[in-house]
Amino acid sequence: MELNEIYEYARDHMQKSLDVLKKDFNTLRTGRVTTAVVENIKVDYYGAPTPLNQAASVVAADATTIVISPWDKSLLGEIERAIQEANIGVNPNNDGDQIKLFFPPMTVEQREAEAKKAKQFGEKAKIAIRNVRRDANDKIKKLFKDKAITEDEEKRGLEEVQKITDEFIKKVDDLVKQKEQEIMKV
């Protein structure tokens, strides 16, 4: 394995950590409700736990309403029960044809709690990025130990991995800050 391959490995895996962070952010509630809040709720679909978005059409009708239209109307009760068990802070409104979820405007406390979750997701991403850095550094040190690279190349390699790490940590910080502003905006 060459140094360039190690850098590529580090970039790829750190990018995956960023992608996971963005996915995690989709589950957070902002001033506008998104379908991501309910899409991964599992519904018992003929004995198999199935994500809600695979058993029904899930649409954000407006800033505070999500409409769920199951492909199979016999699932209405099951979907309603799954939403109540998911404890997302709303009661499902079943009209016999579809389920509507009315989300009240977020309170300051709820916004602060969501912002705190955003920070926690950011910390989780930073830990993952640092773990990738550790793995990349270990690979570089092994190359030096096996005499595949010189001491100078080892030093340059470790510095380059640190630069890549700093770049991705900054991206995480920027994303967290942006998400917090989005959450706190009334």
Curated annotation (Swiss-Prot):
Q: Which GO terms describe its molecular function?
A: ribosomal large subunit binding
Main localisation: cytoplasm
- On the tree of life, the source organism's domain of life is Bacteria
- Please name the GO terms of the biological process aspect recorded for this protein, alphabetically: cytoplasmic translational termination
Q: Where in the cell is it found?
A: Cytoplasm
Q: Name one GO cellular component term.
A: cytosol
Pfam families xrefs: RRF
Q: Which UniProt keywords apply?
A: Cytoplasm, Protein biosynthesis
User: Which InterPro entries does the record match to this protein?
Assistant: Ribosome_recyc_fac (IPR002661), Ribosome_recyc_fac_dom (IPR023584), RRF_sf (IPR036191)
PANTHER family in the record: MITOCHONDRIAL RIBOSOME RECYCLING FACTOR PSEUDO 1 (PTHR20982:SF3), RIBOSOME RECYCLING FACTOR (PTHR20982)
The family annotation for this protein states: Belongs to the RRF family.
Q: Which NCBIfam families match?
A: frr
Known function: Responsible for the release of ribosomes from messenger RNA at the termination of protein biosynthesis. May increase the efficiency of translation by recycling ribosomes from one round of translation to another.
Name of the featured protein: Ribosome-recycling factor
Q: Which organism is it from?
A: Nitratiruptor sp. (strain SB155-2)
- Species lineage: Bacteria, Pseudomonadati, Campylobacterota, Epsilonproteobacteria, Nautiliales
